[in-house]
Amino acid sequence: MSRTSLTRFLIQEQHAGRINADLRQLIAVVARACTSISIAVSKGALGGVLGDAGTGNVQGEAQKKLDVISNEILLEANAWGGHLAACASEEMDHSQPVPDIYPRGDFLLLFDPLDGSSNIDVNVSVGTIFSVLRCPTNVELPGDDAFLQPGSKQIAAGYCIYGPSTQLVLTVGHGTHAFTLDREKGEFVLTTENMQIPAATQEFAINMSNQRHWEAPMQAYVGDLLAGKEGTRGKNFNMRWIASMVADVHRILTRGGIFIYPWDKKDPSKAGKLRLMYEANPMGLLVEQAGGAAWTGRERILDIQPDQLHQRVPVFLGSREEVAEAVRYHHAHDNAQG
């Protein structure tokens, strides 16, 4: 029996009235760009792409060579197709409208070109995360303000993970689906339809080295996880941590769990570590479409009205019952504080 290619899947979604032709073509372009990034990543040291680029991004983080390469691949692939009005990237200070020499479309594309790139030199899975919004009407030349929409306004989101196989995980608002790159044919093929995250879990993913910086409800919540069967939770938990959001979330979409990157006092000026627009929103939509939940610990991520392009937030996402439990600890603490 023949498998369904990404192209066929998108055409079927268009015929069902769930996406239009422009969105179909935009997603196809992003997928092709991810294929190019996958090739660059897989060459590793042979391609001379490892190591630092000697530059920094708007967040003050050192850029890897592959950060810069991946960003350029996505920008160049999407500039001329006529589907986009503007792009925004974690690696750029401001959004970038489509050049005047090309036609402008109705969509805005946001992306983290290479999430987890600090792991690339040690051959750990990394990935590309992307989100699609509609450009506000009557905006001729969209700037940063055009992107400041809550995650609930996303019309598509996805990520591509570059691991033992390259997989594209995608939602257009009707379930979350996984496609695997067939390298011989050069196309993505549907391998898991309607991914579902188990409601309950006994796995959590968190960087425990930051424990001393956490606020009280986080200390209590994780303390009860570690207490296991002898504690108030009455069951044992396993901890997993890859330090690559794409890899950690992919595991959760595949077999369940909760991914946590809370606010901490290590840098109290920042509201969290992860970026709302490039990481939390697209991953939140993918997880919710797979039956999971995505919160900051106190509010649903997709409800947040952003006030800046590179805004950061705490993130709790994955199995919905466990996310609800973590939220309960935070609300109980806040209520006790009055």
UniProtKB/Swiss-Prot annotation:
GO cellular component: cytosol
Cofactor(s) the protein requires to work: Mg(2+)
Main location, first listed in the record: cytoplasm
Gene Ontology biological process terms in this record: fructose 1,6-bisphosphate metabolic process; fructose 6-phosphate metabolic process; fructose metabolic process; gluconeogenesis; sucrose biosynthetic process
Pathway: Carbohydrate biosynthesis; gluconeogenesis
Keyword Flavoprotein tagged: no
Family annotation (SUPFAM superfamilies): Carbohydrate phosphatase
Enzyme Commission number(s) from the entry: 3.1.3.11
Binding site for Mg(2+) 1: 90, 112, 114
CC cofactor note: Binds 2 magnesium ions per subunit.
Residue positions binding substrate: 115-118, 207, 273
Compartments where found: Cytoplasm
Residues involved in Mg(2+) 2 binding: 112, 115, 279
GO molecular function: fructose 1,6-bisphosphate 1-phosphatase activity; magnesium ion binding
UniProt KW keywords: Carbohydrate metabolism, Cytoplasm, Hydrolase, Magnesium, Metal-binding
Domain of life: Bacteria
UniProt subunit comment: Homotetramer.
Family that this chain belongs to: Belongs to the FBPase class 1 family.
Entry-linked HAMAP family: FBPase_class1
Protein name (record): Fructose-1,6-bisphosphatase class 1
